């Protein structure tokens, strides 16, 4: 088991800021407590420098938003270019697949 780090420690950081296009936006679903959940994919494309070489980066990944953030994603809609702030976690407790949990988003 991974030790639980001190919340003030830099080892506890898990923050992602990334831009992309919302794709595959599923119909919203709801938790038993009535919170909206929005699941979608974010398609990212950029140019990045690595070891002095320009690289074209293109990929898609799964993201999930809950409550007010989910409502915002649903309003923004599929095909929109956004900047997302969030953290990475396992898709569920039985999976090792990673997903971005969205804390905030804005249209760009």
Swiss-Prot record:
<keyword id="KW-0235">DNA replication</keyword>
<dbReference type="GO" id="GO:0006269">
    <property type="term" value="P:DNA replication, synthesis of primer"/>
</dbReference>
<feature type="domain" description="SSB">
    <location>
        <begin position="11"/>
        <end position="108"/>
    </location>
</feature>
<comment type="similarity">
    <text>Belongs to the PriB family.</text>
</comment>
<dbReference type="GO" id="GO:0003697">
    <property type="term" value="F:single-stranded DNA binding"/>
</dbReference>
<dbReference type="InterPro" id="IPR000424">
    <property type="entry name" value="Primosome_PriB/ssb"/>
</dbReference>
<dbReference type="InterPro" id="IPR012340">
    <property type="entry name" value="NA-bd_OB-fold"/>
</dbReference>
<comment type="function">
    <text>Involved in the restart of stalled replication forks, which reloads the replicative helicase on sites other than the origin of replication; the PriA-PriB pathway is the major replication restart pathway. During primosome assembly it facilitates complex formation between PriA and DnaT on DNA; stabilizes PriA on DNA. Stimulates the DNA unwinding activity of PriA helicase.</text>
</comment>
<dbReference type="Pfam" id="PF22657">
    <property type="entry name" value="SSB_1"/>
</dbReference>
<keyword id="KW-0238">DNA-binding</keyword>
<dbReference type="GO" id="GO:1990077">
    <property type="term" value="C:primosome complex"/>
</dbReference>
<protein>
    <recommendedName>
        <fullName>Replication restart protein PriB</fullName>
    </recommendedName>
</protein>
<dbReference type="InterPro" id="IPR023646">
    <property type="entry name" value="Prisomal_replication_PriB"/>
</dbReference>
<comment type="subunit">
    <text>Homodimer. Interacts with PriA and DnaT. Component of the replication restart primosome. Primosome assembly occurs via a 'hand-off' mechanism. PriA binds to replication forks, subsequently PriB then DnaT bind; DnaT then displaces ssDNA to generate the helicase loading substrate.</text>
</comment>
<keyword id="KW-0639">Primosome</keyword>
């Amino acid at each position: 088991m991974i030790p639980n780090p001190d919340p003030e420690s830099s080892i506890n950081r898990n923050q992602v800021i990334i831009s992309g296009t919302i794709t595959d936006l599923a119909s919203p679903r709801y938790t038993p407590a009535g919170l909206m959940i929005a699941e979608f994919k974010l398609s990212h494309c950029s140019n990045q420098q690595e070891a002095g070489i320009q690289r074209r980066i293109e990929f898609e990944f799964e993201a999930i938003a809950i409550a007010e953030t989910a409502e915002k994603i649903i309003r923004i809609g599929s095909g929109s270019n956004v900047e997302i702030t969030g953290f990475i976690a396992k898709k569920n407790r039985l999976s090792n697949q990673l997903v971005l949990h969205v804390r905030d988003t804005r249209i760009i």
